[in-house]
Amino acid sequence: MKAAVVTKDHRVSIEEKRLRELKPGEALVKTEYCGVCHTDLHVKNADFGDVTGVTLGHEGIGRVIEVADNVDSLKVGDRVSIAWMYAACGNCEYCTTGRETLCRDVLNAGYTVDGAMAEEVIVDANYAVKVPENLDPAAASSITCAGVTTYKAVKVSGIEPGQWLGVFGVGGLGNLALQYAKNVMGAKVVAFDINDDKLNFAKELGADAIINSTNVDPIEEVNRLTNNKGLDATVITAVAKTPFNQAVDVVKAGARVVAVGLPVDKMDLDIPRLVLDGIEVVGSLVGTRQDLREAFQFAAENKVIPKVQLRQLSEINDIFDEMEKGTITGRMVIDMKSSH
């Protein structure tokens, strides 16, 4: 079968791979679609360590074509996800308290185990979440990582109906965060970016305000919008240091700043302001299986509609080049069916 494999020179090669036999608790999935995530770029570039030889992909959607004898959670024909959280231990302090993404023994698709940029993929049957049949599978691929990541981040922000949430970076993740915040949580949303095309798209999606922080002072604009109160919370999906710092600067006392994007950098924090204004800065890592079920359902109800562009597996290096240049709007999704 064809698979997108990380090479030593930080590129991706389309290679023929043979899968092993299923082990107890596993299922075999024929991949339909796989989204391309910024984390895939980090993995390819060895930002988290050298994983040469691994098959990329953690935004996979496909149909189960075989299950191991002892599997009863899935059956042949089910449409399921192949997500970043491939499997966890199920027994640690994190797994038993609803924080399974923090499990120290977690396995990650497309990083520590082979992922979904392949014609077929082996999954842990207990961690492959079923996809609603009325949800377009190409759109579902974006929900599998980008969607659940931003949905969870918006939940972590604690935003309530009518409050102001700032979304920093409104590309593939940010435009989904905007939709979950506005259409599910009932928040008012300010979109921040330095790309006018992305900001205009955010406006089309319902952003209450858009701010290009290279043209105006974001603090002044937020003060104007909120009568000098500041935002109730911010979510950062951008992958640069500046928006992380700005996301702290524009919030009110008692606000929460949620970090999602993964720039290889450090934040500058004004410690007296954090203490005196009671500002919380927290990280949010993807989402649990239950978060993913909820994220899928809201998408199935058309409350969140990912903007996807279908590409071919052979274009994977071109997609990464575009990603590094910052020219992508929405989500790039590889049509794996065309490679079968």
UniProtKB/Swiss-Prot annotation:
CDD domains assigned to the protein according to its UniProt record, in alphabetical order: CAD3 (cd08297)
Gene: adh
Protein name: Alcohol dehydrogenase
UniProt key word Chaperone: no
Naturally occurring in which organism (per UniProt): Staphylococcus epidermidis (strain ATCC 35984 / DSM 28319 / BCRC 17069 / CCUG 31568 / BM 3577 / RP62A)
EC number: 1.1.1.1
Protein family: Belongs to the zinc-containing alcohol dehydrogenase family.
InterPro entries tied to this protein: ADH-like_C, ADH-like_N, ADH_Zn_CS, D-isomer_DH_CS1, GroES-like_sf, NAD(P)-bd_dom_sf, PKS_ER
Binding positions for Zn(2+) 2 per the UniProt entry: 89, 92, 95, 103
